[in-house]
Amino acid sequence: MRQINQTQVTEFLLLGLSDGPHTEQLLFIVLLGVYLVTVLGNLLLISLVHVDSQLHTPMYFFLCNLSLADLCFSTNIVPQALVHLLSRKKVIAFTLCAARLLFFLIFGCTQCALLAVMSYDRYVAICNPLRYPNIMTWKVCVQLATGSWTSGILVSVVDTTFILRLPYRGSNSIAHFFCEAPALLILASTDTHASEMAIFLMGVVILLIPVFLILVSYGRIIVTVVKMKSTVGSLKAFSTCGSHLMVVILFYGSAIITYMTPKSSKQQEKSVSVFYAIVTPMLNPLIYSLRNKDVKAALRKVATRNFP
């Protein structure tokens, strides 16, 4: 037994969302439906922005980047979870687990940065409308989007390195449905304080700093909107920002609970992870499309053109 414990783990057993066969069948149907809506919703949003010239603006450029990150974020997790719901042996190789952890963090961290960039875009559009075209040029937009993806990659590489450098020689059972940092740290065969501190500091960089920037941006927006004499202008400004604010609250709220708060129960961690890893990517395109007149107009235009 001592020799077994000293052997490096080569695969992990994912305990999943449930161990009941009937519950797993129901979860498979629900997750499959959610994933299909996520894929179709985000692809539709990206396609609409691509084909409709009225949507060729900085706001929709960033929205396309967010939809792409959402799509990749969900695709990295859900298909594997669906396969495991139908499998008796829910095993994942160490290398594959490491790869999925890295991509999960990349797409998640990129979303954090993009949401902060989108709040800055709304701030400039509402607080400096006359200077907006000169400030948010396409060159600046590409730089901001590239910076978001780059920061997401850098933070993710640091987090993943600190997690994977730990020895895993004991239990290989992960009390989760995918390879997530907090669930993996529990299995490490050594002190994880340094790794936890590194993840916390990266969380400050990619979670708390963007949240602070978003709050500052929306604080300035609210002050500007309150000063507006036109009721129509105020309502339009709040409507434009409302969708983004809803997405920010949903994603950041659940992510901060997972990575920036004291450890909670395993069941609570899984529930929060389901929300921000599976549900939020599905809700984002729905929130932006259902609350956005431009997107709905583009959808009607495409529908009329193809189904007269």
From Swiss-Prot:
Glycosylation site residues: 5
CDD domains: 7tmA_OR2D-like
MF annotations from Gene Ontology: G protein-coupled receptor activity; olfactory receptor activity
Domain of life, per lineage: Eukaryota
Bilayer topology annotation: Multi-pass membrane protein
Key words, A-Z: Cell membrane, G-protein coupled receptor, Glycoprotein, Membrane, Olfaction, Receptor, Sensory transduction, Transducer, Transmembrane, Transmembrane helix
Residue ranges, Cytoplasmic side: 50-57, 121-139, 220-236, 291-308
This protein's name: Olfactory receptor 2D2
